[in-house]
Amino acid sequence: MVSFSTLLTACTAITGALGTPDLDRRQNVTPNAQGTHNGYFYSWWSDGQSPVTYTNSAGGSYSVEWSSGGNLVGGKGWNPGSAKEIRYSASWQPTNNSNSYLTIYGWTRSPLVEYYIVESHGEYNPGSSAEPRGEIEAHGSIYKLYESTRVQQPSIDGTQTFQQYWAIRQTHRTSGTVTTGTFFNAWAAAGMPIGQHNYMIVATEAYNSAGRASVVVETPP
């Protein structure tokens, strides 16, 4: 899968002052935005190629529905992120097991890192194009660790070369608790250090697919 989420900040920098996204009725595409909603940080981006709606709901809830094609990623969480126990529940329904995943997603600086803790994914395994870095057992499952280098790609600091870290759950689930510090420590032990935290969200991500998701972040903002 194209790592379209790395485009997020570059594309939302222009739209960050928009506040809570509203549906563009003419194009049926929710505008890109970042901000705060009911105490939670949220981030939303799509490339505009798929009819898609992202909706911030009460508390830590959000929903997203996409129809076909295009790249999109969004969700609610914290800015900055941290070693945190994240409780979440979701109805995550990619059509026909299509290319999508439900993930904890975030960035750090010094070093500049984009990271994923993937709880569920469709037919495409996002670790398939990365280098394996071992595995850990956590939260009742094996998580396989991967690393890749993104060369001169969009990031939270503009176009940069940076590392991308993955922890991919082998027994998929759509609700539970993720202790992010467990994965930060596992990555560090594998020679993959985490830096100073930027944002961290419980995200829905999709590429050239269709589906819907309703997600509740239960951990307080």
UniProtKB/Swiss-Prot annotation:
Domain GH11, residue spans: 28-218
Molecular function GO terms recorded: endo-1,4-beta-xylanase activity
Recorded metabolic or biological pathway in which this protein acts: Glycan degradation; xylan degradation
Gene: EIX4
Pfam families: Glyco_hydro_11
Designated name of the protein: Ethylene-inducing xylanase 4
Keyword terms, alphabetized: Carbohydrate metabolism, Glycoprotein, Glycosidase, Hydrolase, Polysaccharide degradation, Signal, Xylan degradation
Annotated SUPFAM superfamilies: Concanavalin A-like lectins/glucanases (SSF49899)
Primary role: Endo-1,4-beta-xylanase involved in the hydrolysis of xylan, a major structural heterogeneous polysaccharide found in plant biomass representing the second most abundant polysaccharide in the biosphere, after cellulose. May act as an elicitor of plant defense responses in certain plants but does not exhibit any cell death when transiently expressed in N.benthamiana.
Residues glycosylated per entry: N96
